[in-house]
A protein has these predicted regions:
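Glycine/small-residue-rich loop that forms an oxyanion/phosphate-binding "nest" at active or ligand-binding sites
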Residues: 66-105
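Hydrophobic faces of well-ordered beta-strands that scaffold small-molecule active sites
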Residues: 6-10, 29-31, 57-61, 104-108, ...
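Charged helix-capping and loop-helix junction motifs
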Residues: 119-125
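A short alpha/beta connector and helix-capping loop motif
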Residues: 15-43
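Active-site rim beta-loop-alpha module in soluble metabolic enzymes
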Residues: 144-171
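Acidic (Asp/Glu)-rich catalytic clusters
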Residues: 20-26, 45-58, 97-100
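Glycine-enriched alpha-helix->loop->beta-strand junction motifs that scaffold or abut catalytic
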Residues: 25-29, 51-53, 129-136, 152-158
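Catalytic beta/alpha-barrel core
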Residues: 31-36, 115, 134-144
Length: 171
């Protein structure tokens, strides 16, 4: 019989007050890296907490939309979006490495996550951004998403489900 496990991942470094209490309960964290929330101080603090708790560390880039917590679609040129994603992921990657860790994954946040799931052009920009940063990390994607289709075979994928949502047979 095959052993099945649940990988529990949580968005952290977003200004919440329970990051420290959540760390021992999860296997991975997605750290806000400046787009919708977070700054150098919160990234360093959250990375240290994750390393102390032996938690996998992921980047959680978003549209540069702090006013709406990254929940609204933003019109950006492909180049603007690419540079924004690269800048956010690279900032966190450098912090993780400076603290002696390794970036394990990337999970988009909010509207960017949803847009990349549905819009092939946005997915292509995301892929170009991530490929320019290397391929030594996993990518969290929704089932049956444009981003998942494009990333298949290029990145190791984790298909994600949310415990508080209902799902149809197609994911």
């Amino acid at each position: 019989m095959m052993k099945q496990t649940i990988h529990i991942n949580c968005d952290l470094g977003e200004g919440g007050e329970f990051d420290e209490k959540l760390m021992p309960l999860i296997s991975a964290c997605n750290i806000a890296c400046g787009g919708h929330a977070g700054n150098l101080e919160t990234m360093h603090r959250t990375v240290r907490l994750a390393l102390e708790n032996n938690i996998e560390i992921g980047a959680h880039p978003s549209y540069p939309d702090r006013a709406n917590f990254g929940r609204n679609h933003m019109e950006m040129t492909a180049e603007e979006l690419k540079l924004s994603i690269e800048g956010q992921v690279l900032s966190l990657k450098q912090i993780v490495e400076s603290e002696g860790g390794k970036l394990s994954h990337v999970k988009l946040h909010g509207a960017l996550y949803n847009d990349a799931a549905k819009d092939r052009n946005i997915s292509k920009v995301v892929m170009r951004s991530l490929e320019d940063l290397g391929d030594d990390f996993r990518l969290f994607v929704p089932v049956n998403s444009q981003l998942g289709e494009l990333a298949l075979g290029r990145f190791e994928l984790y298909y994600e489900a949310f415990a508080d949502r209902n799902y149809e047979d197609d994911g």
